[in-house]
Amino acid sequence: TTYSLSKPQEFLSAKALARRARQQLSVDSTDLPVCAKYVEAIRKQGVRIVVTGKWDNFVTVSCNDSSRMARISRLPFVRSVEKVWQQPTRKNKDKALKRDSITDKVVRVDSLYYGKSYRQIQMSKADKLHEAGFRGKGMTIAVIDAGFHNADRIKAMQNIHIVGVKDFVNSSCDIYAESSHGMKVLSCMGMNQPYVMVGTAPEADYWLLRSEDEYSENLVEQDYWAAAIEFADSVGVDLVNTSLGYYA
């Protein structure tokens, strides 16, 4: 690799390094990006690079010719090759997402500061944390999910501080036109509309990351998730909410 552990600022953000120092977590060889020469050698076999993972040292590619995978398996630095994805049917592919209309009907609960979230807040004792001054200020949270449908257009969510978004499933997709699950998860934490809905961390900053492909169930989603969690670490997030689970 062209990177060096003596220069971690070349592959980790200043915020990530500050968090590591604060938590006494050293930078080690697993933090080094996947060797660029290896990635390029794989690309030259006629495949498209989808994601890479430095912690488990993998490269995920896409191609429609199994002979290319056979050639890749013979490269001296490749330990093994595994099929992790299959093209979904046309029916599933055509499910793709259109922005539907938004009903911006704000429902106030004038007797409750937390609005619709009061039960969850009371159950988790988050109101006590808020009273003590812990409202998420200064913290960065990554939400790894299947999509954040219309979170950028819902008026009640406009004061959630989103610092960035990234799609690991398909970089050409609109992360705000995908599944609504992540939007709902985000609202439980980031909403900050008194008497409508106040979440558990209304003053935090948020990264929105998509790793779940709701149109198919394939092992590649574990690769997407690994790439997303590595990215979250590299930009220095403090916490990750990932309402997803996989098994081998």
Regions found by a protein language model. Name each.
Residues V51, A70-S73, G133-F134, G199, ...:
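Structural motif
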Residues R74-M139, N150-A156:
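Protease zymogen maturation seam
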Residues S80, S117, D127-E221, V235-D238:
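Subtilisin-like serine protease catalytic core
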Residues D28-P33, S62-M69, R119-M123, G138, ...:
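Soluble non-cytosolic domains of exported or imported proteins
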Residues Q86, S211, G245:
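Short, ordered loop/turn segments at secondary-structure junctions
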Residues T1-I102, E214:
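Inhibitory N-terminal propeptides of secreted protease zymogens
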Residues I229-A248:
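Short acidic, glycine-rich surface-loop motifs adjacent to enzyme active sites
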Residues A36, E40, S67-A70, D127, ...:
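Solvent-exposed, polar/charged alpha-helical surfaces in well-ordered, non-transmembrane soluble domains
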